[in-house]
Every structure is written in structure tokens, then in C-alpha cells.
Amino acid sequence: MSLIPFILDLAEELHDFNRSLAMDIDDSAGFGLYPLEATSQLPQLSRGLGRGNAMMWVPIKGQSAASQHRHHPYNRVAGAKTACCNKSLVELEKELGDKGTSGASGSTSGQPAASKSAYSVVNRNGFQVSMNVKQFAANELTVKTIDNCIVVEGQHDEKEDGHGVISRHFIRKYILPKGYDPNEVHSTLSSDGILTVKAPPPLPVVKGSLERQERIVDIQQISQQQKDKDAQPPKPSEVEQQAAASATTSTLNPTAPTPTPSLSLTLAESNGNGQEETEMEMPAVSPPISNEAAAAAAVAVEAPSTAGTTSSANNGVAEPESESMEVALAKNEETANVDEPTPNPVISIEEEQKAEDANANEVPVASNNGNGAVAAAEDVEMPLAKKPEISTEDSKEEQAEKVDKVEKVEEKGGEELAAVDAAILLAKNQGENGATAAKTEELAK
């Protein structure tokens, strides 16, 4: 058997031992203290062949990587394992250190040590959580449910000797098992400081106990006639039927037009024969809005009666209609006179009279100032003769002036309407007087 492997192992162990001694002397942390990762590890000089680096009196083969980073001098004396629990002292110390660290952090943050005794149980009696909270008063504890989660919270502040404040606070969360109702959760606090949170178990669901809802559906027999009726389109509603019936009735029996009060028109017109037309009564037919020509003609007929009832500036009789209507009717009358004579849809005038009298539509209105009556008398006394063209031209000029005046009246306000009306009547009287003078001169010739 060769001694070479044994000699190599011994040399390696001696090298490790010498290095460990140097670390023990030069370590500033002191002997017996175990700082974790306090000093940088020297590079591994061993050739390793699968064995760990043991800095101990007795080398331990197969040591874990976590223990290789710690320097523990007690392993030189105590050995690798203990006889009682078959664990190395390093592992035991590590476990104790973890417990001490957790305990220190718990005391620092104010976590009560007794709260670690809380436990939860799920059995046939339901879900139950118990915890020792004797360091908390009842008003310092809060139990609430968020969806299917139970949250237990405690907050305690205590002042000691006026120098410091001890604060304890904890939060515990528990998930309810599936099927438990959060609304059924209730909690109790005993006199010895045990808080119990309970939730009753859900009702057992037995598959056989489920009641089935059964209903027998009747089979109705449908005849062929009902089938044909169902195939027909739906009938209109009663409202539509009534509307159709009323429309049919109105079509068969058209309603007569409502008679309007007749307007007595006194037209003192002198035709070519010098005869005076008598009064005639006719119903005032309102022209359709869409037909502009008929509307203009109807307004031309209604204008004399309206102007006849209009009060002049001489007698001061109250006006029956609005001033705006007067202006509109006067404008329509003058426009109809300027344009070519249009047939009146209400009054049927013979074409022969139109041919004889070129100024048939120029109807002087018998106003209340008395001038119209004199003109009518003079027309009766005159012999049969045609009117000269001079009067026609003068009348056209007067009509153009009247149209201009009416347009100006529309632009003016309502305060000047009475004065403008008087001016229009005066212009009409002057036109009548001019026509009479022209006739007199013709007769004198």
C-alpha cells in the first residue's frame, strides 16, 4: 500500500491548520466572536479533490458550503458531531441564533410573544381561531372580514415613567375555507385574555335532498283556421283603426268652408260710359298662402273696405285694424295698380269693361273726408267720353309715388304711421282733383 496519498493529505491538513492559526491571531473581531462575512476569505489554495476546506483541528470531510464561510474555533475541541443529537455545534448554534434574532426583532417591533400561540382549527364545529391577547384591552382589538378573509388587529400604546413609550401592534389574517359565510363570523374575548374567532360550518348539501321543480306543460291543439290567422300579418291597433275611419269619413263628407262675414264694398268707380256701379256684397274668400297671385288679388279686393273703414285725419274715428295691416294692404294695392291688371278671383268683371277702361283697377275709395263723394257726382254729370292719356300717366306717376311712400312707411316706426296715412289720403285726393281738372280742360276744348 502506497503512502503517497496519506502524505499528501497530511500536508494539506497541516497547511490548513497553519492558515487557521494565522486567522485566529490576526482577526480583529476577537476570539470567541463569530462575525458573518466580516473578513474577506483568502483564495482557496487547496487542490480539493472533492473535499471541503476545514479550518479545524480535526478536518471534517463533506462539509456544506454554508459552513465553509464561517470560522468556528470550538470545532477544534468539540469535534464534528455531538453524541446527544447527532448535530454539530455549528448547526445547533445557528438554530439558536436564528431563534434569538427573531425574538429580538419581535421585541423591538412590539410583537407580543404570547400572540405566537395563536392557532386555527377547522373541524366539524366550524372554523375557529384562538390567540392570547392579554396585553391588549378589548377596545384595542379589531376583528373584521374582507371578502373571505378574517383580519385581527391590535394596537397598544403604553407610557412608562414619562421617558419612553412602549407600543405593541399586530395584524393576523386568516382565510376562510371554501363555503364559509363571512357574515356568520363572530368573536369572543375571555377574562384571561384569549381571543376566539369562530365561523359556523356551511350547511351540508345532500344531493338526494334537492327538490326538483317539475311542471307539466299542456299540449294545445290548434285548428287549421287558427293556423291561417296566425300566419296573417298583425292587425293595426285600435288607435290606427280609428284614425283611418275618421280620415275616410272626412273624405266622403267634406266640410263646407266656414262662411266669413260679407264685406260691403262701396266702389265709386267711373267707367268709360260715365255710369256709377252700385254696391255689391260678396264673401271675403281668404286666398291660399301658396298661390301668390291669388293672394295679391284678394288683398286688392279687401284693401278698399279696409281703407274705407280706416279713420282719416279729419274726423278722428278709431281704427278697427292694426296699423301694420294697413301698411301691408296699402302696399299690395299700389303694387297691383302699378302692374298689369289681373283678374279678380272673387269679382267677375267683363273683359269689355276692362278694354274700355284702362284704369279699371284704380278704385278711388270713398273716404270720410267728403272728397270722394264730390268726385262721384262729377263723374255722373260728365258726358260719355274716354279719359285722356294724360290722366293715366299722371295716375301712374301718383301710384309710383304712393308705392315709394308706402315703402318708406315700412321703414319708419309705429309712431309716424298716422301721419303717413293722412299723407296717403291727401295724395289720393290730389290725384282725383287732377283727374277732374284734366276732364274739365278737355270738355272746354
Curated annotation (Swiss-Prot):
Transmembrane segments: none annotated. Disulfide bonds: none annotated. Pfam families: HSP20 (PF00011). Keywords: Stress response. InterPro entries: A-crystallin/Hsp20_dom, Alpha-crystallin/sHSP_animal, HSP20-like_chaperone. Residues 109-220 form the sHSP domain. Residues 384-408 have a biased composition (Basic and acidic residues). Residues 306-315 have a biased composition (Polar residues). One of its GO terms (cellular component) is cytoplasm. CDD domains: metazoan_ACD (cd06526). It comes from the Eukaryota. Residues 243-268, 365-377 have a biased composition (Low complexity). One of its GO terms (molecular function) is unfolded protein binding. Residues 222-284, 296-408 are annotated as: Disordered. The keyword Transmembrane helix does not apply. The keyword Hydrolase does not apply. One of its GO terms (biological process) is response to heat. SUPFAM superfamilies: HSP20-like chaperones. Belongs to the small heat shock protein (HSP20) family. This is Heat shock protein 67B1. The gene is Hsp67Ba.
